[in-house]
Amino acid sequence: MGKKKKRDGAAARRQARVVVGGVRTRAAVTARRVVASAEEGCGLVGRGGGGGSGGDDGEGGCYLRLRSRRLPFVAAAVVSSRREEALGDSVAEAASSSSSRAVELLGCSGEEEAMAEKVCTQAGEDHDEESSVGDSGCGRERSATTPSSRRPPGDADSSDAESNQEAKQQMCRRSSTTSAAAFHAGATTRSFRMMAPPAAAAEIEEFLAAAERSEAERFAAKYNFDVVRGVPLDAGGAGRFEWTAVGSG
């Protein structure tokens, strides 16, 4: 009993030293602050896993309270998942842009095939008539595919894509028209070569006779000699030469 009383007395004396006239000492205040901050930190860590008041940063993370600010700690799994989501979005955008590009290219090739079929079906018609019809058709198609000026200002990307597609279609039409003109020119030349009959013998003789006649007249006027019959002309002719008979002996 004596020892217990001594211990109780020592505790009372220590408590009296700590609390003097209702005022706490500096050591007790510091100890209480340390305990309170530790309890508050534990509470924040417990709330971080549940996501109650942590917001977006509470998913797999917690707050570390400092003297001036709080630092959020995010788990590595959350960071990797967010990076994967961003990468997936970028891949999806690239795939959509490539698909739209492929659609534009396919549209241009289909237009070219349609123009080629139209040219093949109209191969027997006149070239001038076909050119006028093609020009009028191109004008109608160009007026139909021209983007409207009343398009809203937020649709600038789609208008640029349509203008690029229209330019590609015009290039395809020009190339197909040029190839069609060359094809028709070659076909016309081949048909003329195949349909032209050979010249008759009478036509050839008539052409050569006219040339021989003009050459005989020129020779007679200069040499006073008839090359057709092989005899000299009269002395009173227009030629400068006179012919005399020479004896054979």
Curated annotation (Swiss-Prot):
<dbReference type="GO" id="GO:0005634">
    <property type="term" value="C:nucleus"/>
</dbReference>
<dbReference type="GO" id="GO:0051726">
    <property type="term" value="P:regulation of cell cycle"/>
</dbReference>
<dbReference type="GO" id="GO:0004861">
    <property type="term" value="F:cyclin-dependent protein serine/threonine kinase inhibitor activity"/>
</dbReference>
<feature type="compositionally biased region" description="Polar residues">
    <location>
        <begin position="161"/>
        <end position="180"/>
    </location>
</feature>
<dbReference type="InterPro" id="IPR003175">
    <property type="entry name" value="CDI_dom"/>
</dbReference>
<dbReference type="InterPro" id="IPR044898">
    <property type="entry name" value="CDI_dom_sf"/>
</dbReference>
<dbReference type="InterPro" id="IPR044275">
    <property type="entry name" value="KRP"/>
</dbReference>
<dbReference type="Pfam" id="PF02234">
    <property type="entry name" value="CDI"/>
</dbReference>
<protein>
    <recommendedName>
        <fullName>Cyclin-dependent kinase inhibitor 2</fullName>
    </recommendedName>
</protein>
<keyword id="KW-0649">Protein kinase inhibitor</keyword>
<feature type="region of interest" description="Disordered">
    <location>
        <begin position="118"/>
        <end position="180"/>
    </location>
</feature>
<comment type="similarity">
    <text>Belongs to the CDI family. ICK/KRP subfamily.</text>
</comment>
